[in-house]
A protein has these predicted regions:
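Rhodanese-like catalytic fold shared by cysteine-dependent sulfurtransferases
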Residues: 1-30, 35-40, 45-158
């Protein structure tokens, strides 16, 4: 539409496929493990204090820069599929990361808009076998989006 390009997105079923191809990782600290063994790279934009519970196969936050630089340096690295997710559907950091990666020349960047909130809600309903995470999270609401109506009321009362 118009002059702006639309953002490529994936849904929870696409993410389940990614999880099925994720393999357990052992002693991979600061290696090119993620850039050489998978056809995709899964990146999250969660704050550093929220890295304990992730979707399996997610690149550790401390390895993101090394992995991205390795892809940039590689001959076909910029065509690698990269999937970005965050806290929830209202998490703007996901779209900022998307723009950053596209600006670096990556061609196949996609966004999982539901983020951890949707994933954990689906896990709660359908189970961890269908919606696995790297650890069990009991407080699903810490991933929920802020209420738009609540912020509107605050503005109206000012």
């Amino acid at each position: 539409m118009g002059a702006s390009a639309s953002i490529a997105k994936v849904n929870y079923e696409d993410m389940q496929c990614v999880c099925r191809t994720a393999t357990p990782i052992q002693d991979h600290k600061y290696s090119n493990y993620y850039t050489t063994t998978r056809p995709w790279l899964l990146i999250n934009t969660l704050p550093p204090g929220m890295q304990a519970c992730l979707i399996p196969g997610t690149l550790p936050i401390e390895e993101e820069e090394v992995a991205i630089n390795a892809l940039i340096a590689g001959s076909d690295g910029k065509t690698r599929e990269i999937i970005v997710y965050g806290k929830n559907a209202n998490d703007d950091t996901v779209y900022k990361k998307y723009q950053q990666l596209m600006g670096l020349g990556f061609k196949n960047v996609r966004v999982y808009p539901g983020g951890m909130f949707e994933w954990l809600l689906l896990q709660d309903i359908y189970g961890a076998a269908s919606f696995p995470t790297t650890s069990k999270e009991m407080d699903l609401l810490k991933y929920k989006p802020p209420s738009g109506r609540q912020s509107q009321r605050l503005l109206m009362n000012s």
